[in-house]
Each structure stands twice: as C-alpha cells, then as structure tokens.
C-alpha cells in the first residue's frame, strides 16, 4: 500500500470548526500516486487555537471533513474526503460501495473536461450531496407566531427605515442650509480679506510716508546741525586768518578753502516732489471746495427763491380755486336758469304751435267769412230798400198800436206774417246778418240805462204799496226752462199767430212793414264783445234752436217787436222831459219776456262794414259755439 498523508482540518478560525466548508486541504506529496480506498477517518482536533468554548461546543454537534489529494497517473489531482463528526456508524457509507466511485472520479477533471455535459455534472453533484449527507436533518415547520414575529420585525425595520429617511431628509435640508450659510460666509470672508488687503496696503503706504517724513526731518536736523558747525568753523578760520594776517601782514599764504560736504538723498528729492504734488492737489482741492461752497450758496438762494415762488403759486392756486368755485356756482345757477328757460321755451313753442293752429283755423274762417260778407251786404242793402217806404204808414201804425195797447204789466203778442216771396233768398248769410244785428241792437248802452230806470221805478212802486210784475234780470233762462217751440208744435204756433194777425187787421200789416224798415235803418249799435255773446246766447237758448235751425219767422217777429218798442219810446220821449228815464216796455220774444231799450241813431252801411272789419276772428269763433248752446 502507498503511504497517505492526511490533512486534518484546523478549527483555529473564529467562526468554528464544525462547518464542513472550514476544512483546509493539504497537498499530498508526489510519492503517493493514488488514495487508499479503505482509509479510516482519524479523529481531528476539534478546537482551534483561536476559538474558545463556543467553537468547542460546535465541534460536538457538527462534523468536520478532512481532504487529501493524491497525485496519480491522470493530469487532474484526485481528492479524497474524510468525514469526521458525531454521526458514528452512519458515516461509514462514505468509504464503501457507492462512494468508491465518487472518491475515484476526478471531480476537477469532470469540471474541466469539455465532453462532460450539464446533466452529467448535475447528476454528479446530486450524488455528491447524497454521499455527503445521507441522512439530512428534518425541516422545521414555520408557525404563525414565527410569521407574526417576522412581520413585526419587518415593520420595525420599515419604521427604522422611515425614521432614517426622515432624519436623512432633515439632515439634507440642514446641510443645504448650512451650505448656503457657508457660501455666504465664504463670500463675506473673501470680501473681508480683500478689505484687509486694501487696508494693509493703505497702512503700508502710510507707514512709508511717515517713515519718509521722519527721515526727511532727521536729515534736515542733521543738515542744520552740520551747517551750524560749518558756520562756526568758518568763523573760527576767519578769526585765525585775521590773526595770521596780523602776524604776517604781507605775503602770507592763504590756506585753501575746504570743500563743502554735499549730502545726496534720493528719497528726500522724491518726497519733495511728492510734497509739491500734494500741495498742488491741495490747492486745487481748496479751489474746488471754494467753488462748491459758492455753488451751494447759489443753490440755497435758488431754493429760497423757488420756495417763495412756490408760496406765491400756492396763493394764486388758492385764489384761482376760490374763483373756480364761484364760477362753478355761477355755472350751476346758469344751468338751472338755462333749464328753466328751456322749459319756458318749450312751453312757448307749444303755445306758438297752438296759436299757429288757431291762426290757421281763424284765417280759414276769415276767408270763409270774407266770402260770406258781400252776400250779407247785398242782403242789408235789400233790407234797406224797405226803409224807403213812407213815414206815414209808420205813424199810422203807431197810432193804431197806441189805441189797441194793453194795460201796464201785460204782455203783448204780435203775430206778423211777412211774405217770404219779398225776399230774394233765405241763405245762411241772412241768418248770420240777422244775428249780428240782433247783438248790436240788444247790447246798446241805453238798454242798461233803461234797466236801471226800471229798478228805480219798481222801488218807488214798492214804497207806494203797488207791486209791479217782476222784471227779467238775466237774459239767460233757468235750467228747467223749455222753449215754447218745444212745448207747442210749430203748426199750432203758426195758427195762433195767424189768429192774432186776423184780429189786428190790415192796419197792423202796414205798421209791421214800416217798423221793419225803420228797424233796419236804426239797428247799428257799438257793443262790447262779451255783452254781445251773452245776449246772443240768451236769445238762442230762449228760442231753443241752434244757429243752423234759426227760424226766419221767429227772427222777423222779434224784429217787429223791437221796432214797436222803439216807436213807443220815441213817442214817450216827446211827452216826457229829457231828464226823466224812459219807460219800460215788455214784449214777447217767442215765449220769453225781454226788456227793450232806446235805439242809437242809424248809420250807413260803410260804418257797418268797418265795424265788422274791426272785430277779431277769435270773437267770431267764440260766438259760433256760444250760439249753438
């Protein structure tokens, strides 16, 4: 048999000697060509030099391997593993039967050989594991407590990691803040260093200047001392020369003068030049300072002037503001006045428009009345023709009426029938002319005088005890008054009038014709517009008809009544003195009792035209609707 060398694994490491991987192989000497298959394992020391009781306890529980390599005929070395441990007879299988092939197989050669495939290598490794650990330890089951413990440990580690991360973030922030502060401090340090260098330079320059000044002062003092000494020596020499001349007055040689000692100092010259420059700069600076002082004085003067001007301007602004306030108030007043004037202007414009419309209407009416005027003149001339009848018939009619007159206070009814064939036509122009003549006739001033006389007469009669019939005070009828034409039909009224005419006889007809002619000659009074309107309105209301329904028979009857009253007044004027008032006459006006008055003397047709021309169209416009009421 070949001798073998066993290499025992040392347990000197601090990790313990029980681990199979801790075995250290030892090289076999060259004399051993192959390992011995039936080699028995020898016990190896379980303790290492450096391990204590802990490593010794591990050697009791675990085993150790001893590996010996034997160099044989093959290129790769052979390795033999010897298991040493507490397994006892269970480890005897490593050296018998199944393990002999493993020990003899060159493992390194199998790993290096290129022909060996992956499955072969895996099978070899599996067999090796089975040979090394034929009876593995049973696996320990993991319980829920172990899982909870592990989870708790993991949570603690996560908490530690989170806290470490937070601490790291805070440290990073602090580090960034400190870095910024450090940068600021570095910049401040750099600026401070620059200032220090600048100050050092200035200090060095000042030291140099002070040293130069001190050196120059020392040199000047030395020069002054030397000059004083030289002056004293010269005085002494001069005295000696004088003494020698006294001793040797003639031909005495004069001693040569001593050369003056010259002190050449380049720093002194540089300092002098610098001093000159500094003096020049100082003078220049003084001039500039004086100039600046002058400028400051001028600036102060200008500032004072500006302040004065500003105060004046502020005063002017205050005055202007007051003026502006006053003007604004005036402007507001003017605006109010303007608004008022505009309102008045609008009102006046509206009035002007209304007046313009009225003037247009009046112009139209005037044009229409101008067209009607010649027809009315023709009708008036035709009626004047009736006045050319003899006065005798009129006087006869008057006498006949006096004989057949009624007693005082009675009402006389006259029924006249004028032949309508005597008139050429009965247009509306004739009705208008009759209305105007009626207005003028009724609104005579003598009518109002007669009314006053009647009142006085009534008062006298009351004193005497006689009660006269009540006169009519107003021309307007009462509200509940009804015209006779409305109460009695026209046919019956005509029949009554015809009866009256039949009783009077033909004499009354002749008297009526004469009275009509006389009335048309004498009816032209000048009356007031308002009085005329009232009378016409009362006449039309008494008739109960409008201007368009004016009855010619009724109008002619009124004219005849007025003519009769006029003739009676004329007769009374002949009998009664001029100072006495005219008697009162009452006639029937179609059912209404109207007081009559003396008539103004007649005028020609030209006066009638002038009177019509003087009347404004507005009065005529007012007369039209008043007559319609």
From Swiss-Prot:
Protein name: Huntingtin-associated protein 1
Keywords for the protein's UniProt record, in alphabetical order: Autophagy, Cell projection, Cilium biogenesis/degradation, Coiled coil, Cytoplasm, Cytoplasmic vesicle, Cytoskeleton, Endoplasmic reticulum, Endosome, Exocytosis, Lysosome, Mitochondrion, Nucleus, Phosphoprotein, Protein transport, Synapse, Transport
Record region (Sufficient for interaction with KIF5B): 153-320
GO cellular component: autophagosome; axon cytoplasm; axon terminus; centriole; centrosome; cytoplasm; cytoplasmic vesicle; dendrite
Entry-linked InterPro entries: HAP1_N, Intracell_Traff-Reg
Protein's organism: Rattus norvegicus (Rat)
Tissue: In the brain, especially in the olfactory bulb and in the brain stem. No detectable expression in peripheral tissues such as lung, testis, spleen, and small intestine.
Coiled coil: 169-300, 328-369
PANTHER family according to UniProt: HUNTINGTIN-ASSOCIATED PROTEIN 1 (PTHR15751:SF14), TRAFFICKING KINESIN-BINDING PROTEIN (PTHR15751)
Function noted in UniProt: Originally identified as neuronal protein that specifically associates with HTT/huntingtin and the binding is enhanced by an expanded polyglutamine repeat within HTT possibly affecting HAP1 interaction properties. Both HTT and HAP1 are involved in intracellular trafficking and HAP1 is proposed to link HTT to motor proteins and/or transport cargos. Seems to play a role in vesicular transport within neurons and axons such as from early endosomes to late endocytic compartments and to promote neurite outgrowth.
Domain HAP1 N-terminal: 80-404
Stretch list, region Sufficient for self-association and interaction with HD: 277-445
Subunit structure: Self-associates. Interacts with HTT/huntingtin; enhanced by an expanded polyglutamine repeat within HTT. Isoform A interacts with ITPR1 and APP. Isoform A interacts with AR; decreased by an expanded polyglutamine repeat within AR.
Biased composition (Basic and acidic residues): 237-249, 388-399, 606-623
Main location group: cytoplasm
Region Interaction with TBP, residue ranges: 158-262, 474-583
Biased composition (Pro residues): 32-44
Subcellular location: Cytoplasm; Presynapse; Cytoplasm, Cytoskeleton; Cell projection, Dendritic spine
Positions with biased composition (Low complexity): 20-31
Compositionally biased region (Polar residues): 1-12, 52-62
One GO MF term attached to the UniProt entry: myosin binding
UniProt-listed GO biological process terms: anterograde axonal transport; autophagy; cell projection organization; cellular response to growth factor stimulus; cerebellum development; early endosome to late endosome transport; exocytosis; hypothalamus cell differentiation
Biased composition (Acidic residues): 215-236, 480-495, 505-528
Region Disordered, annotated ranges: 1-71, 213-261, 363-412, 458-531, 563-629
